[in-house]
Swiss-Prot record:
SUPFAM superfamilies from the UniProt entry: PLP-dependent transferases
Keyword list, A-Z: Amino-acid biosynthesis, Aminotransferase, Histidine biosynthesis, Pyridoxal phosphate, Transferase
Source organism of this protein record: Bacteroides thetaiotaomicron (strain ATCC 29148 / DSM 2079 / JCM 5827 / CCUG 10774 / NCTC 10582 / VPI-5482 / E50)
NCBIfam families per the UniProt record, alphabetical: hisC
GO MF terms held by the record: histidinol-phosphate transaminase activity; pyridoxal phosphate binding
Gene: hisC
Residues recorded with modification N6-(pyridoxal phosphate)lysine: K206
GO biological process: L-histidine biosynthetic process
Protein name: Histidinol-phosphate aminotransferase
Gene3D superfamilies per the UniProt record, alphabetical: Aspartate Aminotransferase, domain 1, Type I PLP-dependent aspartate aminotransferase-like (Major domain)
EC numbers for this chain: 2.6.1.9
PANTHER family: HISTIDINOL-PHOSPHATE AMINOTRANSFERASE, HISTIDINOL-PHOSPHATE AMINOTRANSFERASE-RELATED
Catalytic activity: L-histidinol phosphate + 2-oxoglutarate = 3-(imidazol-4-yl)-2-oxopropyl phosphate + L-glutamate
Lineage summary: Bacteria, Pseudomonadati, Bacteroidota, Bacteroidia, Bacteroidales
Presence of keyword Amino-acid biosynthesis: yes
Pfam families attached to this UniProt entry: Aminotran_1_2
Amino acid sequence: MKTLQELTRPNIWKLKPYSSARDEYKGAVASVFLDANENPYNLPHNRYPDPMQWELKTLLSKIKKVSPQHIFLGNGSDEAIDLVFRAFCEPEKDNVVAIDPTYGMYQVCADVNNVEYRKVLLDENFQFSAEKLLAATDERTKLIFLCSPNNPTGNDLLRSEIEKILREFEGLVILDEAYNDFSEAPSFLEELDKYPNLVVFQTFSKAWGCAAIRLGMAFASEAIIGILSKIKYPYNVNQLTQQQAIAMLHKYYEIERWIKTLKEERDYLEEEFAKLSCTVRMYPSDSNFFLAKVTDAVKIYNYLVGEGIIVRNRHSISLCCNCLRVTVGTRVENNTLLAALKKYQG
């Protein structure tokens, strides 16, 4: 791995971050706050939130078994995706490499930041070759993006290939584990000490059932987290989001129950979906959704819209001709989908 200074944009490396009076305060526990020009009325919403989210990070660290200093929290995982571009990639000079197909925001953030985005096509089983991915890199490649389980394909990427990338690539490896809670594969969080170039993304939006609060997580070395924290906006995670996340962490048992139920529903829905006359092929899933090849994705998607049912039409992306991505819902929702498709006359 190159040094972090070599990977970081020079202006970011030298940047002095914004600091509030409360960041700098080292005295006794404060009871009077006259530093931030806040309105003294309408407690508690009149006060700015903790800019570093220490209470939330401390609770999260106990569940994830990662030190709070190795955790970055953002306004959704998309903030963390954008920040790694802004921190490490020089516009019009550097490039990133990613598997294809995968989550679309990696390319959106590359385009917004004017960074070349290089795609390496997956094979027919939606797996990648580390050799091919590494062959697409050059001396200006700062980041490699991997998503496991991958979106939209739903499958885990081969661990041995991920490890090869981590060993041989000199830049940062961004591993998006948004759907790892639904997988039998262990998280790469346990490998953070082994691979200093590893950055793991996770989210409260999927298994945790908190998409509305927009809270994403990045886990990495303390030095990498320090760079991301340096360039984030001062109060990027609002107080209501922090409070809701803390409440969820106190009832982790319920999240585990949801995960178990959703995995059972996934198995049920996959089995029943495979029996439909419009289904051509089912792709194995390690997530809370699956990809299915159907007779005519556009027609079936439009038919379902007319029935008040929304699925994701993935027909136009690489390797997904006539494919629909279907999220696992409740038993009632799943049966409503199945009933509608049984009536479909294609």
